[in-house]
Swiss-Prot record:
UniProt keyword annotation of Iron present: no
Gene3D superfamilies with a match to the protein in the record: 2.40.30.20, ATP synthase alpha/beta chain, C-terminal domain, P-loop containing nucleotide triphosphate hydrolases
Organism, scientific name: Heliobacterium modesticaldum (strain ATCC 51547 / Ice1)
Protein name: ATP synthase subunit alpha
Chief place of localization: membrane
Membrane-spanning parts: none
Binding site for ATP: G169, D170, R171, Q172, T173, G174, K175, T176
Length: 502
């Protein structure tokens, strides 16, 4: 059977009529210059600031500069495969990261991609890395304590949920140790922790993750890692990505703690990007908006009002100083943004006082309202006595003949300094801190040798846990020292002192 030519023509016409080519309209541009993690692109006039762009080979970029005839874009990932003339597409989306409980226990990069080899993360939600901070009406003043487990901090520079407390000090003074101890102490407190490592050595980050795993802290922690080998754009977005992950829990009415370790390296990465994008340099060659870089990040930490769920996001930014210079550009910026600072000193660290907190210039501007009453009752005199001790110790170096009152004050001060020492990774619950500091400020340690103070503390706490557990239970539940409880605590200290043999 043969087909006639007109039948063939009719079949072809039918097929042509039915043919539908799916049209895909994409806004695309061309790379005109690339290098050092920066690309200049021509032809994307409608691009938005902060928009995600797609380069060939599944590499993404983020728009930072919008100029008359081209746009400046930072490349989030390996940029060696990108060349001039490549086509770049708009995605129409602002840079987002996966958020939600699926990330807990994982180590991810700033784009939310897993780095721990435990398989893909099937997050159901995404959040833009840049989002506006909650307004005044949505907030509530800080009033709940966030215990760090460190006696020196919880007594003298208390931190509340929703606060921003800066940890500042030279390199190797124990800044990360304070942050890691705080994470370990959140066990069982229903606080999700996000540790953001910016520009750290990969071995250091691996060490932190191992420590958290050993103490069971990875069950409620997300680690965002942008190591020193990553390109500057990833270091720049890492804190914002970590903050977005924390905000998910904040708006769900839960409590989150975000640690940025450290923001000095983020500022350096941002300076690098700004100079490459030909933005005018300012003081110390940082761009003019370096204050806004950190303020818009730290303002996202908040304690929400009950109408908005009552969630909280606490921020502990870390800043590294050079030779103890707190008055440099970035440290002063971040000090003015935060609600107080914990200043760690290398001199104290090397003299064996660890955590090496300088009580004189460490402050917490809002944490006092969050401190439990029992701690306020015992720690009120602690800061004053320590300050007097430091002043007298400086004078005592010049004269040997001191009157009895001065000598007694110096002796008390030495024991207070000793009692505030604490080993790493051994956070202490608040009721035990109250009992120990109570003994120190009320002079019960004055007749104990300085070398035996920590041994006394260990024995006394063991005695309280076994013989007088009801005292600790009452402090924990009532959160205040009544006259009756104070009398029983004094009695317990007296009873233990009789049995204590150094």
């Amino acid at each position: 059977m043969s087909l006639r030519p007109e039948e063939i023509s009719a079949i072809i016409k039918q097929q042509i009529e039915r043919y539908e080519k799916p049209l895909e309209a994409a806004d695309s541009g061309t790379v005109i210059q690339v290098g050092d993690g920066i690309a200049r692109i021509y032809g994307l006039e409608k691009a938005m600031a902060g928009e995600l762009l797609e380069f060939p080979g599944q590499v993404y970029g983020m728009v930072l500069n919008l100029e008359e005839d081209n746009i400046g874009c930072v490349i989030l990932g390996p940029y060696t495969g990108i060349k001039e003339g490549d086509t770049v597409k708009r995605t129409g989306r602002i840079v987002e990261v996966p958020v939600g409980p699926e990330l807990i226990g994982r180590v991810v990069n700033p784009l939310g991609q897993p780095l721990d080899g435990k398989g893909p993360i099937n997050a159901k939600q995404f959040r833009p890395i840049e989002s506006p901070a909650p307004g005044v009406i949505k907030r509530k003043s800080v009033h709940e304590p966030l215990q760090t487990g460190l006696k020196a901090i919880d007594a003298m520079v208390p931190i509340g949920r929703g606060q921003r407390e800066l940890i500042i000090g030279d390199r190797q003074t124990g800044k990360t140790a304070v942050a890691v101890d705080t994470i370990i102490n959140q066990k069982g407190q229903n606080v999700i922790c996000i540790y953001v490592a910016i520009g750290q050595k990969a071995s250091t980050v691996a060490g932190v993750v191992k420590t958290l795993e050993e103490h069971g802290a990875m069950d409620y922690t997300i680690v965002v890692s942008a190591t020193a080998s990553e390109p500057a754009p990833l270091l720049y977005i890492a804190p914002y990505a970590g903050c977005a992950m924390g905000e998910y829990f904040l708006y769900k009415g839960q409590h989150a703690l975000c640690i940025y370790d450290d923001l000095s390296k983020q500022a350096v990465a941002y300076r690098e990007l700004s100079l490459l994008l030909r933005r005018p340099p300012g003081r110390e060659a940082y761009p003019g908006d370096v204050f806004y870089l950190h303020s818009r990040l730290l303002e996202r930490a908040a304690k929400l009002s009950d109408e908005h769920g009552g969630g909280s996001l606490t921020a502990l930014p870390i800043i590294e100083t050079q030779a103890g210079d707190v008055s440099a550009y970035i440290p002063t910026n971040v000090i003015s943004i935060t609600d107080g600072q914990i200043f760690l000193e290398s001199d104290l660290f090397f003299s064996g006082i660890r955590p090496a907190i300088n009580a004189g210039i460490s402050v917490s501007r809002v944490g006092g309202a969050a401190q439990i009453k029992a701690m306020k009752q015992v720690a009120g005199r602690l800061r004053l006595e320590l300050a007097q001790y430091r002043e007298l110790a400086a004078f005592a170096q010049f004269g040997s003949d001191l009157d009895k009152a001065t000598q007694a004050r110096l002796n008390r001060g030495q024991r207070l300094v000793e009692i505030l020492k604490q080993d790493q990774y051994k956070p202490m619950v608040v009721e035990e801190q109250v009992a120990v500091i109570f003994a120190a400020v009320n002079g019960y340690l004055d007749d104990i040798a300085v070398a035996d103070v920590l041994k006394f503390e260990e024995g006394f706490l063991k005695y309280l846990r076994t013989e007088k557990a009801e005292i600790l239970k009452e402090i924990r539940e009532k959160k205040a020292l009544s006259d009756d409880l104070t009398a029983r605590l004094k009695e317990a200290i007296g009873a233990f002192k009789k049995t204590f043999v150094a």
